[in-house]
Structure formats: C-alpha cells, structure tokens
C-alpha cells in the first residue's frame, strides 16, 4: 500500500474524477482540478442518468451491479424508480431475443412482455408496431446533482481540495513524483490521476505519456411536448438503440442515440441529429413532435472495447488512467471510483467489488499497449447518457 501522506492530483471534475477523489481523500492529500467554473460541465452534467444493470459486456455489468448498493440500496437513494423498457418493432424480434438472453440470468426481475403490454406501459406505441418489449423494473432515474454533491462533500470532509477554473498545463517529472503546472502555480504531487474524459490524451501528452485509443462521440438530445401526461412513462429505448424517450418534467426527452466522432470541445447540438431523432421517434410511435423546447449535446468518450481504462500507465507508478467511461459514467461511478482509488493506492479490492466479481484486469490500460489485445465492439448498450 502507498503512503498515507501521498499527494494526489486528480485532473478532471466529471463524475469519474469526483468519485475517485471521494474514495481517495480519506487516505491521501487529494487535490482535484477542473478547468471549468462548475463541476461535471461537459458530460455528466448533460446526462439522462438512468441506473440500469442491462448495460454493456460482463465486465461493465459487474461494475453496474456493484454500484447499486451505493446508489439505490440506501435510506435515501440517489433517485427514484423508473422502469426501463426496451421496445422492438416486428422486424427486430430477434434482437429482443438476443438482449433477453444476454441479461435474463443477471438482472433481477427482468421481464419479457408482449406488444399489448408494451402499449399499456408506453401508450404511444400501438401493438401493431411492436414485437414486444423487455422491462427492467428496478431501473431508476438518478439525481445527478445530489450524487455530485455527495462526492464533493466526501472529498471536502476528508480534507481534500476542489479547485475550479484551474487549468492543467502539464507536468515535469521529478525524482519522485511530478511538478504539475496549474495555471501559474507549480504543485508538487506524487501521483497524477487522469480523469479528463475527452481531454484524456491531452493531459497524457502534457505528462509525456503516449495517447490511448480514446474516441469522443457526440450525441444530441432535445425536449418536446408529448401532447399529454408522460410522467408515468418508463425510460424507453429502441432495442437497437436508434432512439430513446423518457419523461423530463412536464415534457419528454428524446434522442437519436447517435455517436458522431468528434474532437474534444464544448459540444453543441447538431440540427441534423436532432431532426433524425424526431424522425425516428415519430416513425416508431404515434407522437407528433411539432417543435423542440430545448436541445443540447455532449461528448461520451470510449475505448475500442467500450470499457474504461482504469490503472497505471505501464512502466509508471505515478500516472494513473481513469478515462473512457462512455455512457456508463454516472451509473458505474461508485464502483469505478472505488476500483480506481484502491488500484491507485495499491490497496485490497473493496469487498463490495470483489463480491460482485469485478475484475481489475478487464479495465487495465495495458491492454491497449499490446497490439491486438483490444476486443471488438460489444452488443448495443442502453442509451443512458445524455447526450
């Protein structure tokens, strides 16, 4: 285990950096820096934030399942129950079969329903437009603001520091650790945790570290008047993730669930992508979307195998990767934060992660340093992340 007095710099104030810093702060001197004036500005703060266990491959499923105890199984959960409904048009019945087979034995209460039951839950899909659906009754809307507040509070109560409008300008290697340049200030630290999302490779280059194969993907979303009371609707996702709809206050939120390759930037909504979302939703349902109330976009950053990179840069004991959460950042943040903190400290894997079968090697960034070790694109994942 590393020294208790270790000075750790976490670069990035998204949900990844916050959760990791929250678990590190009781054991080290933690400073989290964020270039923007508010936390979680670029991705987390634009999130549709659903808790679901129907997510990703087995490694991602395990960190999602492990996160339930922190997010849901508590006196005051970070959200409220909203079932998740995967809906398939008649021509995609096989895709629904495949999705059911993938999660049936893993997700408690997962239920296959017929077209009439789909219509009962989501009345804007007539029975003739659906082959059926798959319902996860234990899914939840997550309160991102409450979760961010909890992580920030844990950091500060443990003596950690959160610095806003603090731009990371690079580091210089010392005999032991780094001298980090934060705006005009030099800060000596023992360990750098790179939790910079779409900017992860820019931070790495500032430390003289080779880039990882990270790809920021832009997604646009919008709200609209559903023409009636949508409050009781589930979170509805097309089985092949071509669109999604969920209640959003007095309105409904929609998206084409697109993944448009992008550069790291303050993303803005794409008019064509918004129009595509409207077209897909209106073709699949009886909704008439005559106007858009609000629209926005954000970046979701992925590795080639769609698992985050969590671990030390091979050959370094002072540069730690925590990037590539993609659409799983919010819902996996307790498990991913605890995993990253334990690995960064050289500590034993927390019991709740071990009990869930979380395997740290599944997320080791070393898998991208050996040619041919990254796996292929996994099955479609729920569009839980706005955008």
Residue ranges and their predicted role:
Residues 6-31:
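N-terminal Rossmann-like FAD-binding beta1-loop-alpha1 element of flavoenzymes
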Residues 9-11, 187-199, 337:
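Short hydrophobic core segments
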Residues 22-25, 51, 76-83, 196-318, ...:
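Active-site substrate-recognition segment that forms the wall
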Residues 25-44:
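Glycine-rich FAD pyrophosphate-binding loop
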Residues 48-121, 242-243, 280:
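Dinucleotide-binding Rossmann-like beta1-alpha1 core, especially the glycine-rich loop
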Residues 73, 87-158, 163-164, 170-176:
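Flavin (FAD/FMN) cofactor-binding and adjacent substrate-gating region
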Residues 169-187:
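Conserved beta-strand-loop-beta-strand element in the redox core of flavoprotein oxidoreductases
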Residues 283-387:
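C-terminal catalytic lobe of FAD-dependent flavoproteins
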């Amino acid at each position: 285990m590393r020294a208790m007095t270790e000075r750790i710099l976490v670069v990035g104030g998204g949900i990844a950096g916050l959760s990791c810093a929250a678990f590190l702060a009781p054991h080290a001197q933690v400073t989290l820096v964020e270039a923007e004036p508010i936390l979680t500005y670029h991705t987390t703060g634009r999130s549709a934030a659903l808790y679901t266990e129907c997510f990703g491959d087995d490694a991602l499923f395990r960190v999602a399942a492990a996160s339930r105890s922190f997010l849901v199984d508590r006196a005051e959960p970070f959200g409220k129950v909203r079932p998740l409904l995967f809906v398939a048009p008649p021509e995609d019945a096989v895709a629904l079969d495949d999705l059911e087979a993938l999660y049936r034995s893993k997700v408690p209460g997962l239920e296959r329903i017929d077209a009439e039951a789909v219509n009962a839950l989501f009345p804007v899909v007539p029975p003739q437009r659906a082959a059926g659906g798959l319902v996860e009754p234990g899914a939840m809307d997550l309160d991102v603001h409450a979760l961010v507040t909890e992580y920030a509070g844990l950091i500060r109560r443990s003596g950690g520091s959160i610095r806003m409008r603090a731009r990371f300008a690079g580091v210089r290697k010392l005999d032991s650790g780094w001298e980090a340049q934060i705006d005009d200030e030099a800060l000596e630290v023992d360990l750098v945790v790179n939790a910079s999302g779409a900017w992860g490779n820019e931070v790495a280059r500032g430390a003289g570290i080779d880039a990882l194969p990270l790809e920021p993907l832009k997604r646009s979303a919008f709200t609209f008047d559903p023409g009636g009371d949508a409050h009781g609707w589930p979170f509805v996702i097309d089985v092949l993730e071509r669109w999604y709809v969920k209640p959003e206050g007095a309105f409904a939120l929609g998206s084409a669930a697109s993944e448009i390759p992008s550069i790291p930037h303050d993303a803005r909504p794409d008019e064509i992508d918004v129009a595509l979302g409207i077209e897909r939703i209106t073709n699949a349902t009886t909704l008439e979307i005559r106007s858009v109330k609000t629209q926005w976009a954000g970046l979701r950053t992925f590795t080639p195998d769609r698992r985050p990179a969590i671990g030390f840069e091979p050959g370094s004991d002072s540069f730690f990767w925590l990037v590539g959460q993609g659409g799983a950042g919010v819902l996996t943040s307790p498990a991913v934060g605890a995993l990253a903190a334990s690995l960064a400290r050289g500590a034993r894997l927390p019991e709740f992660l071990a009990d869930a079968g979380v395997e740290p090697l599944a997320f080791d960034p070393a898998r991208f340093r050996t040619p041919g070790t990254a796996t292929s694109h996994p099955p479609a994942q729920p569009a839980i992340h706005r955008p």
